Regions:
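Conserved RecA-like helicase ATPase core segment
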Residues: 4-6, 10, 19, 48-52, ...
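Helical mechanochemical/support elements of P-loop NTPase systems and associated helical scaffolds
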Residues: 70, 74, 104, 133-134, ...
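Accessory N-terminal region flanking or inserted into the helicase ATPase core
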Residues: 1-32, 41-45, 60-62, 125, ...
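Structural preference for long, well-ordered alpha-helical segments in enzyme cores
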Residues: 42-50, 62-66, 70, 74-81, ...
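P-loop NTPase Walker
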Residues: 1-122, 128, 256, 344-347
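Short hinge/gating elements
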Residues: 119-125, 226-228, 329-332
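Conserved ATP-dependent motor core of P-loop NTPases, especially the RecA-like helicase ATPase domain
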Residues: 65, 86-197, 216-220, 235
Length: 385
């Protein structure tokens, strides 16, 4: 299937940069796709091209994204595209063409646990706690612990909040409570070594030390909270990713099985993945496996919940070619959504970020939208805005 065939099949005029991403050889590569450049369209077309050219069968493709809504949208677009392929090219029913597996990152980790959790002593039928049940269990741990929490100076409700936050942050960064305690102990020693002169220059030192000591105390509580979940055979979302990461990194046979099952892996919104998610994925699919990550470093907005934009910046090192060399990086920069004036403003505002993340500025296509304009206003009320 050539470019013209695919354009006609999907009724989309693919640009050269889009076609380069769609028809790239099997192997690991990252697509840095700016806003409005057709990221989802390219991912859908990549699936169709791989199946149409018989590189892989549809059911050998794994696609991961973040939300159930995004999963449903990608599934619908891929299913519609494959239906066109089955009708117009293969002339066979869609159920004979097959469908890729598309899910959220957390659902994939949950599947991993269901199939392999016993390797870590985790029952396949473990229940995932609701938000309310998670808070309730944390409150039980806080009110029943033998540790002296008065040193924190928090109310029980506040302790529950910071406990759950720290538990999730540790899981998303792949850091154990023991590792956190070791870091904070060294940090406190370093600050003390800095001496009183430095303390006078930086008045925040005392507050920083207090926060560090609080983290050490809370890290013990995190262990009690996790133990309480294990005893009850329940887990939360942070457990899913942490246990999935452990299965991927500690049991090579799990990765071998999944690489045989999924010949191609597509990773959506990769700029918003966490360290734990990246370690799970590299544990399963690194070493030259055909992994395509798509994302935009300039749209990384979830660092507050553990996301690491370094994952997309360093993709070609985390997912090298089979010979160990760095994998390819492709770019989608042709914005088909906005006019030239809007793109000029966006590029101007993002200059420092683009330089930091090695991202090219957005450009208009051959047949651009109307130039448009930018208005800036500071209005006194939400209603007026």
């Amino acid at each position: 299937m050539n470019r013209d065939d695919l354009c006609r099949l999907l009724d989309t005029p693919f640009s050269q940069e889009q076609w380069d991403a769609i028809s790239a050889p099997l192997g690991p590569f990252v697509i840095k796709a700016g806003a409005g450049t057709g990221k989802t369209t390219v991912m859908t077309a990549r699936v169709v091209w791989l199946v149409a050219t018989e590189r892989v069968q549809a059911e050998q493709i794994l696609g991961l994204t973040f939300t159930t809504k995004a999963t449903a949208q990608l599934q619908a677009r891929v299913r519609s595209a494959l239906r066109r392929l089955s009708d117009e090219v293969h002339g066979v029913p869609l159920d004979e063409v097959g469908e890729p597996t598309i899910s959220t990152y957390h659902a994939f980790a949950g599947r991993l646990i269901a199939e392999h959790g016993l390797r870590l002593g985790v029952e396949p039928g473990s229940t995932v706690l609701t938000e309310a049940a998670s808070i309730q269990l944390a409150y039980q741990v806080v009110t029943r612990t033998q540790r002296d929490l008065s040193v924190l100076g928090y109310t029980p409700d506040k302790v529950v909040s910071v406990l759950r936050s720290l538990d999730g942050e540790l899981a998303e960064h792949g850091v154990t409570p023991e590792m956190l305690r070791a870091f904070d102990t060294r940090f406190q020693q370093d600050v003390e070594t800095a001496g009183n002169a430095a303390r006078r220059r930086v008045q925040l030192f005392d507050k920083v030390i207090d926060n560090s000591k609080s983290r050490v105390e809370l890290s013990h509580l995190v262990e009690e909270y996790r133990a309480a979940r294990r005893v009850r055979d329940v887990m939360d979302f942070s457990d899913q990713m942490l246990i999935g990461m452990q299965l991927a990194t500690e049991f090579p046979e799990v990765g071998e099985q999944l690489r045989q099952q999924f010949q191609v892996v597509l990773l959506d919104e990769y700029q918003d993945t966490s360290v734990a998610q990246r370690l799970l994925l590299t544990g399963l699919f690194a070493g030259g496996h055909p992994v395509t990550a798509v994302g935009d470093p300039l749209q990384a907005i979830y660092e507050w919940r553990g996301a690491s934009v370094a994952n997309i910046d360093d993709f070609n090192m985390h997912f090298p070619n089979p010979d160990g060399s760095r994998s390819r990086a492709l770019t989608l920069k042709e914005n088909r959504r906005s006019g030239a004036n809007i793109l000029d403003g966006a590029n101007s505002l993002s200059t420092s970020l683009r330089e930091l993340h090695d991202v090219e500025p957005l450009v208009t296509p051959a047949n651009p939208k109307p130039a448009g304009g930018i208005r800036v206003g500071l209005l006194p009320t939400f209603a007026e805005e």
